[in-house]
Amino acid sequence: MRYHIMESRDIRMNLATEEYLMDHADIEEPLLLLYIQEPCVIIGRNQNAYEEINLRYLREHGITLTRRISGGGAVYDDLGNMSFSFVTKKNQTAFGDYQGVTQPILHALHRMGATDAQAGGRNDLYLDGKKFSGNAMYTKHGRTYSHGTLMYHVDLSVLDQLLTVSEEKISSKATRSVRKNVTNIRPYLDEKWQGLTTEEFRDQLLCELYQVESLTAIADKRLALTVEDRQLIQALFDEKYANNQWIYGETPAFDIERRTRIPNVGIVDVKIATKAGIIEGIHFFGDFFGALPIDELEQAMIGLPFVYENVEVFLEKHAIEEYILHFTKQACLDLLFD
């Protein structure tokens, strides 16, 4: 396994670097990326920024907003968080196998004293029943990356102000507080590691992953960027991750809205614009995952009569599960027409 530590503290630059390396790096052996960023919110590929984030709070506090190319929900990072990403050949990682992908991280944390760290839910890691890591995957061109957060000593007080909790995620016994359901890793580590900075925590975790005493022992495993790499990453930053059209998207006027939450799928929110019974625009939002880009399905549905039987025939030819993981044809029909 090779690794690359990102120097930038801008999440938009780090995501641009991640996507660039996924597309262009030599991955004959897996590649591990590590990055830390200034306060920011990253929404999932399929989410609606206006519904997920307190945008006023974000603006007032100078917090960066961007969108990633993978699915899943919104996350808040600051300098107390360390993000990681494994880039592999597609046949080396089963899409949605978060337990398998995160095992090396969990084993490293166990060696540092957080012995109760474990995988749970669809895509999360937990300590003492509280989430400290959310993960997401993306696949294209025979390659897959799985990336996640590691909340080392994040300012948890910000979460309630910034992230919106949907009604579908709130049960009668649940709490509206995001903060009460998450935790930081630092208090669970052996005492000798609890005074580390985020950068020192990153370096020690890397040593534990390789089971070496210091980074000098794995210096030959470190991937360095060329001048050309940096120029192409900057272009991706400008064209995509710092581009408001990518971040906020285009939101046309919709006349039909449906919303559901399904176990092991997540929230699926569909908005449909029709004219004379024909679909003129359709958009699926949510914290779901998918192996294929949802916009490909949306484009294919434009011009389709918004009639149960017509949509049923369409879905027989287009596997909805490829776009929304574990979402069945019948579940889609029920959402659209019930």
Question: Would you name each region that the model predicts?
Answer:
Residues M1-G96:
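N-terminal lobe of the biotin/lipoate ligase/transferase fold
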Residues N81-R122:
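Contiguous, small/hydrophobic- and glycine-enriched helical/loop subdomains that border
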Residues M112, H141-Y248, L292-D338:
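Long, positively charged amphipathic alpha-helical accessory segments at protein N-termini or as interdomain linkers
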Residues A136-M137, L150, T260, V268-G286:
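Short beta-strand elements
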Residues E228-K275:
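Structured beta-strand/loop patches that form or line metal/cofactor-binding pockets in enzymes
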